[in-house]
A protein has these predicted regions:
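N-terminal [4Fe-4S]-dependent radical SAM core
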Residues: 2-5, 16, 41, 53, ...
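Charged, often glycine-rich, active-site loop that binds/positions anionic groups
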Residues: 45-74
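Nucleotide-activated donor-dependent transferases that construct or modify glycoconjugates
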Residues: 2-13, 96-98
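Glycosyltransferase specificity loop/lid
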Residues: 14-15, 35, 45-48
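Glycine- and acidic-residue-enriched helix-capping/strand-helix junction motifs
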Residues: 12-21
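Glycine-rich beta-alpha loop elements in corrinoid/cobalamin-binding modules
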Residues: 20, 24-28, 34-44, 67-168
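Generic N-terminal initiation segments characterized by hydrophobic and/or small/turn-forming residues
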Residues: 2-3, 34, 50, 94
Length: 168
């Protein structure tokens, strides 16, 4: 059994569950892997407060949504390192797929995940998937050399196969 830490590197400060998360968890668990999720969405020192920004520039109607959110005051990098130290993952995976209403949120998730892993200490394999690696794999390898593997296309099954191989 491999240990896989899935990371949701969302910085937009709003809770939209990415469709890739439950599909990956389901397939990985069906292969008897131990899976944990680290969700970055509501860390105060990470969130970009996209709703406030888009309300100010009149893309969104004013709401009281921000008042209903409880942000985590802990340092995201320390929390991430703590989860890694305690869980001891074999693989850290994040994706840029179906994460937000706006396309820009999908494309920057590889970059956001990379920003997180650059500041942590781990021996885990770092793997990313989604739109960017599928569309331009060579560019991803050049831009993010500290990511060990990129998965093109649908990554659920491929990630499970990689995890299966790691445990052999």
């Amino acid at each position: 059994m491999s240990k896989i830490l899935l990371v949701q590197p969302n910085r937009w400060g709003r809770g939209i569950t990415s469709i890739w998360i439950p599909s990956h968890i389901g397939i990985l668990r069906s292969h008897n892997h131990d899976v944990k999720l680290f969700d970055c969405t509501f860390y105060k020192n990470w969130a970009e407060h996209e709703i406030e920004f888009n309300t100010e520039n009149q893309q969104y109607q004013p709401t009281d949504y921000q008042k209903k959110i409880k942000f985590n005051d802990n340092d995201i990098f320390q929390e991430f390192q703590k989860v890694i130290d305690e869980f001891k993952p074999d693989i850290i995976f994040w994706s840029a797929l179906s994460s937000h209403i706006h396309g820009e949120g999908e494309y920057v998730n590889i970059q956001y995940g990379n920003m997180l892993i650059e500041k942590i200490i781990t021996n885990a394999k770092k793997i990313a998937g989604g739109l960017q690696p599928t569309a331009e794999p060579e560019n991803m390898m050049k831009r993010f050399p500290n990511i060990d593997y990129f998965i093109r296309g649908e990554s659920e099954v491929v990630l499970a196969e990689i995890a299966d191989k790691l445990e052999q």
